[in-house]
């Protein structure tokens, strides 16, 4: 089983490569292991935004800010 860090790295690489659906799956897997990491929610939001799923992306960005209101990375 992969760790949240491994899944996050895989997802970031997939984002860079334009594999947005795969990246989304990686970030969702990471979130299932740690639901309180604002960076994971932000990354999931980026993947969703890249897929044109804007409402869901906003929900993820809001969740990231809910966990850490000082998180400047929340898009």
Give a label for each model feature.
Residues 16-17, 50:
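Register position in tetratricopeptide repeats
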């Amino acid at each position: 089983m992969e760790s949240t860090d491994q899944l996050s790295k895989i997802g970031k690489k997939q984002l860079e490569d334009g594999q947005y659906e795969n990246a989304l799956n990686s970030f969702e897997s990471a979130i299932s292991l740690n639901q309180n990491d604002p960076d994971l929610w932000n990354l999931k939001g980026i993947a969703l935004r890249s897929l044109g799923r804007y409402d869901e992306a906003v929900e993820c960005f809001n969740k990231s800010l809910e966990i850490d209101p000082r998180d400047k990375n929340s898009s």
